[in-house]
Amino acid sequence: MLGKLAYRNTKRNIKDYLIYLITVTASFSLIFAFNLVANSDEIVKLCSSMDAFKNSLFAVNILIIFVICFLINYTTKFMFEKRSKELGTYMLLGIKKKEIAYLVVIENILLGILAIVLAIPIGFLFSQFVSLVIVNLLGIPKTLFISLNFVSIGLLIIYFLTIYVLVLLNLLRRISKMTIRDFLYFDKQNEKKMFRDSKKRNVIFVLSIILGVISLFLWNSRCTMDNFNKQETLTYLMVSVIMLIISIYGISTTCADMFLTVLLKNKKMKYQNDNLFVARTFASKARTMSFTFGTLSMLILISLLALNYSSINKASYDISVNLNAPYDVQLFDDKQVFDEYIRVIEEEYTIDNTIEYDIYKEPNHQVQNFFQSEYYDFDPVLKLSDYNRLLELRKMPLLSLNDNEYYIVTNSKFAYEVEDNKDIETITVANKNLKLKGYDTKSYWNSITNTGRFVVVLPDKYVQGLEVSENHLIIDTKEDTDAELENKIKEDMQHQLVKVDENGEINDESYRVNVRGAEIEQQKAMVAIVVSLFMYIAFILISAVGTILAVQSLSDSTKYKYRYLTLRRLGINDKSLFKTIRKQLLILFCVPAISAILCSFVMMSSLNNVYQQILGDKHLYLMYFGLNLIIFFLIYSIYWIATYIGFKRNINEES
């Protein structure tokens, strides 16, 4: 009996919660698609670094589970609210509360099963698209077919059970505490209004604004090249985020009353068209769902940050490769074994050119003082002739120095230590004063020297008599290198790279060897992982926000139908009525997005202080922010349009 009733009710209510069903189905489809890709042997074989994809996905899925739990729990509450009188009537007819609880649970499980049944074929199709994106990001000219596997299906079922067990336990707990009266009047309840005193509300609103501004200033103060790499920066950023969260919730709990107060004080605006009705409707809703608005703003903020971070990560790909491995093969070791390295490489590759260069010690460490001198007590020096040979191999402009000049090559992250630094405008080498001609960051790479974050380029005659610190070998091959070459070098030269000290401890010095092909593969894999996972997170979060607002609005279209029927009886035609509804929904959807968009823009502008040194363009982030904002509004507007259509349908049905 209960089963038939649950099936009938589920079939009847699917139309009202179609948006919710679509979002849950899409969420499970994405989870299943990414699990299929992560557990695919074909994807893992593409790149050794793709093993990290599975571990990263597991961590992301934990976040997604909480978001879907929040979504389903919130929607279940509204489904329960809409049918509370019906359930209360069942109790009046003598049906036990326990049986009513089972009825509601069965209905929710049926909806969930429908979602997961639809999710498997949709997720399978979507996994082919995800694999295509990953293959393109990896730059591999082939198409992969992702096959179904029981591990991914099993994980999907585990996630499904975890989510629904948590949601349904919470629902059963709520039902167990309710009486017949609670059931009959449950649809009259809302979130409690947090502030009834206008003075207290105004103080909270102003303090929240101030706290938000302070948090963003704190965030900006740490996002500089000077501070970003300091150990305490993470603590400051966490404090800033906590303050921002408090600020967003504070603004969300007070903005509705502030909005209404401003409107009521402006008589011209107050009585213009439908402004008063829209403002009153929004305020009555926002006052009772202020905490929800805060949560939705946080979800939008996270989604925008995820979209922008994935874009910046993709843009920094070429720069990261050149920063770690600008040459086909680069290594530093004893000169005596360079020929052995060359023989290993020649077994499979044709060598076009080799460059040997030395790093020398300048004992006065006049520049090192500004680059954390506690690590080394000398300045690493490179001969001008060697530097020009390196530049020539990379097809970069050559450098010329007079006898009284020197040059600095450093990481872009530390350019601020050199720029406008009067203390290093002149240094003394071999009892002669040398003036700083300039500095360069484009020709720098991380293993140009192992003894610092910069090198001093001197005319050749000044390195005579200086102690040699390191011996480096650069190899240019005719063919493009790959990760297998790096593995081969490390395996064949293990006797040189892996050493045992006097205490019997093994020291693996494989970091001495860098192969460009391996670095390209690793960076492409990292870009593929970051871009796909962060887009996945953003889509789920935006969909969750859109669904909650849609369900909330559609519930109101039924709950407060008398408002719109009254407007019709007062002579408002359908065109004007639907315009009012559009305006009402537009405000409802925009309010949680405004603060999130502003905060995300300020935070990305601050992070750009760091990333512009890497990207080489201080305005590039604006283009990415604009494009990602378009993506956000495209997804968000789909929910707004669907909500508007459903709202109109409910109003017309009631009429």
How would you label these PLM feature ranges?
Residues 15-21, 33-63, 78-81, 89, ...:
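Peri-transmembrane interface segments
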Residues 320-528:
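Nucleotide-cofactor and metal-assisted catalytic machinery
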Residues 1-18, 82-86, 96, 131-152, ...:
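Feature of multi-pass inner-membrane transport and sensor proteins
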Residues 14-20, 104-122, 161, 196-205, ...:
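Selective transmembrane-helix segments that form parts of the transport pathway or gating/packing helices
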Residues 29-59, 133, 218, 222-225, ...:
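Alpha-helical transmembrane segments
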Residues 59-74, 543-546:
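Long, hydrophobic alpha-helical segments
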Residues 28-40, 74-78, 111-140, 152-177, ...:
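Small-residue-rich transmembrane alpha-helices
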